[in-house]
């Protein structure tokens, strides 16, 4: 059935120009006549086409009827209405400019879009006596013909048994259900396959050859169904997880030679080294990729502790090892004494501190005029006298590196006048 002609000599006004009042609204219990029904013509409608919501068995002597988008009959969802007396058409806030209402209550929607799919409510008013109006609602769900779906993937080339893949059935379609097929059959029950709540997304965990596909998805609603083209995952060969072996995890700064080795060994892989997240250049002496498997550092400093990583690569990609951090042994550096230059008078307190850079932490000890005074970073002598004048030295020692170094200063304690302080280094 084609579109009906629009009613002649109709008045068209907006919903803002009409105020409807009713003293009493009761639901109408219709007599035992044929039930009002609504059908879509054509039953399958494609996007961009027209569809007529054709009303059957409409009661006679109706003063008017209203169409709403959705199941709620409020102002926000109000599309259009037809008032029989005066043949008045009223447009509501939900009117898009593509809807036409006819005198038999049928609704034509032109140039249908995806947003037009869903439930429509026909609200009819039946004349009662002078004190009441009888109202009834009829709902109808408009389904658009489902589009041909396609499968999008987060990764069409996963590593076998190592990587997860997300398959999505597109486009997202309202009022439709999603089905998935693998090898032409419904999905097998396995912990490696998991569907989202809407079934639109399929998650594959640790893809193996047994679940590589082909996969198809289907979009279905009550009037149509469409299935995608098949998609098969291209499994890449599994890469072993690399790891680093090293000849010395506790090298001495600027002394020990380090040799890092990336395992496992294979002629099929290229080896790349990383320091602090930056790739290290390949030595000019490396003639074959396999030779870059070993990284030689003639010496290492305290600023090169790492992390170090190695990566094995094939033509499809790579995989990095866990990081390795060195414990570089260094120091002690030349110590510093604070305060380094000061004057003392008899009766004052002498309070000196000694600092150095060292790994592991250095041992500290103090001497005065070559005689051992005490251990520790601080030296405190209360109420010094002239007898405390002399050569003060802080010595530091690192048992791991075997290195020892000292710093000395000469302190002169005077009476009423300031003493002289000079520094010397040994």
UniProtKB/Swiss-Prot annotation:
Which SMART domains would you find in this protein's record? IG (SM00409), IGc2 (SM00408)
**One function term, GO molecular function aspect:** protein-containing complex binding
Q: Which GO terms describe its biological process?
A: Fc receptor mediated inhibitory signaling pathway; female pregnancy; negative regulation of cytokine production involved in inflammatory response; positive regulation of SMAD protein signal transduction; regulation of regulatory T cell differentiation; tolerance induction dependent upon immune response; transforming growth factor beta receptor signaling pathway
Instruction: Give the Ig-like V-type domain ranges.
Output: 35-144
Q: Which GO terms describe its cellular component?
A: extracellular region; transforming growth factor beta ligand-receptor complex
Q: Which UniProt keywords apply?
A: Disulfide bond, Glycoprotein, Immunoglobulin domain, Repeat, Secreted, Signal
Where on this chain is Cell attachment site (motif)?
Answer: 127-129
Coiled-coil intervals, chain numbering:
none
Sites where a glycan is attached: 104, 111, 199, 268, 303, 387
- Here the disulfide bonds are 169-217, 262-310, 354-394
What biological function has been recorded for the protein in this entry? Answer: Binds to the small latent transforming growth factor-beta complex, consisting of the N-terminal TGFB1 latency-associated peptide (LAP) and the mature form of TGFB1, thereby leading to the activation of TGFB1. The activation of TGFB1 leads to stimulation of naive CD4(+) T-cells to increase FoxP3 expression and to an increase in the number of FoxP3(+) regulatory T-cells. Induces the differentiation of a suppressive CD4(+)LAP(+)FoxP3(-) T-cell subset. Induces the secretion of TGFB1 in macrophages, but not in activated CD4(+) T-cells.
Give the family per the record: Belongs to the immunoglobulin superfamily. CEA family.
Q: Quaternary structure?
A: Interacts with latency-associated peptide; leading to TGFB1 activation.
Protein name, UniProt field: Pregnancy-specific beta-1-glycoprotein 9
